Amino acid sequence: VLACCWLAAAAADGNDERTTSDLSESLRRRGETRTYHAYVAKQQSKLALYPEKIRAIDVARQHQVRREFAAAVARGTAGVAGFGGRTVLCLGARLGGEVRAFKSLGAVAVGIDLEPGRGNMDVVFGDFHDVPFAADSFDYAYSNVLDHIYDLRRFGREVARVVKPGGLFFASLYPGASVGGADAWTAKQAASLDDRPAFVAAMRACGFEEVDETRITEDMDLSSVMPPGARNAIWHQKILTIYLRRRS
């Protein structure tokens, strides 16, 4: 059973605008300047606006994540020999596709999301800037929605807090604004492939060290839930997953 201590879901209004002066310019340039509460409301609106698209992405991610990490186990990437009995936290898990992927590999997995939908048995409500679990709860953490980060330093500290010493954070980065990867939900301190050095430096400052990485190229077909002729019906994905170990 995963230990849980529910934390405050939102900061006080006076703390909404958080400092970014110590971050790379590349991690300060994207997303609208908005308050934290406005950011949360924006992120929560996506499922209601695009339910079929979100479901399709969730199913596709489930299969992609399972393939990716089954291959990582086979290679022994970062010393990962298997997920049997290991605890995994999926950050920004949408409807739980990646949670189910890790469960299928033997993990004890759970996800958090600002809008997990109703009756979700795999994902609970939670903000990855204020993770609702106790310190040192998880062997591994995973996220593929780093383009939705509002405050990278706060995010990194929270991941470091809940991952056990010596545990791993699997951080998947995708192409960013320079190649059309940004969208209306790209957040204030979004991290993409463009930002790899700055992202790794920020996570290092939060207590992680980079130990390995994998790169895959894979298409995601969303034509069934997109308007006919839509230019982005096929997502040509270049995915860099950085393996970051929490220092003891």
Over which residues does each language-model region extend?
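Class I SAM-dependent methyltransferase Rossmann-like catalytic core
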Residues: T19-V80
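Short helix-loop-beta connector
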Residues: A81-R86
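Class I SAM-dependent methyltransferase SAM/SAH-binding core
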Residues: T87-D130
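A short acidic, Gly/Pro-enriched loop at the edge of an enzyme's catalytic core
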Residues: H129-A141
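A short SAM/SAH-binding and catalytic strip from SAM-dependent methyltransferases
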Residues: D139-L152
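A short glycine-rich, Lys/Arg-flanked "PGG" loop and its adjoining helix->strand segment in the class I
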Residues: R153-L168
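Conserved class I S-adenosyl-L-methionine
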Residues: F170-A202
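Core SAM-dependent methyltransferase catalytic element
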Residues: C206-F208, T214-S248
